Amino acid sequence: METFLRIMIPFLGTTLGSACVFFMKKSLGDLVQRSLAGFAAGVMVAASIWSWLIPAIEQSENMGKLSFLPAFIGLWVGVLFLLLLDRLIPHLHVGSEQAEGPKSRLSRTTMMVLAVTLHNIPEGMAVGVMYAGFLAGNAQITAASALVLSLGIAIQNFPEGAIISMPLRAEGESKGRAFLGGVLSGVVEPIGAVLTLLAAQLVIPALPYLLSFAAGAMLYVVVEELIPEMSQGKHSNIGTIFFAVGFSVMMTLDVALG
């Protein structure tokens, strides 16, 4: 039950962000959005290294000099999986004027919802893999580091929920429907987390591949979505500073508590 509640934390971030439509007339400030994106990116990069790639390699030590192979394969499968989704699904990233994927007549807001949903899939899977590794007794993955990852993703999801719900409200939707639209964009996260957790427990020998798959998918999201978000608009170092803060927090927890 405790694991399930922790898996729901990222979804809570989306829900709270979507609720901004009830008490805010303007979106979150640029500096706030950059800070949150930078912090989340730092957490995810550190998790990719210490929580996923290094444990994946260590669990494959019986392969000798080829112990890197499961991590290498899993990482590339994760990257290619996200690249494939990016090509197949029409979507529009925050702050971008050019839609990606196949041509579509979908509205701008709908494609923004799809962009958020698209990248929520690997985030949910990453959380599921993290808790699967912890429950499997992986010494490199602690309850604290898994919780920090959930919190880091929740922090990143907060502005995304607002980014979806507030434009829907501006287009004439009721506050309730706008809130629901933001919430629905994050529903795939707990679903993906639970399914991945169950799958990983059924195929423990495949855990190194699943861990590195999560790393590849998350690194793709960081480079494709979070780095542009923390760098857009007027020049500021705030995103970079919070990236370092997020990275340091996750690294410290992983190493100190691992």
Labelled PLM ranges:
Residues 1-258:
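Intrinsically disordered, metal-sensing/regulatory segments
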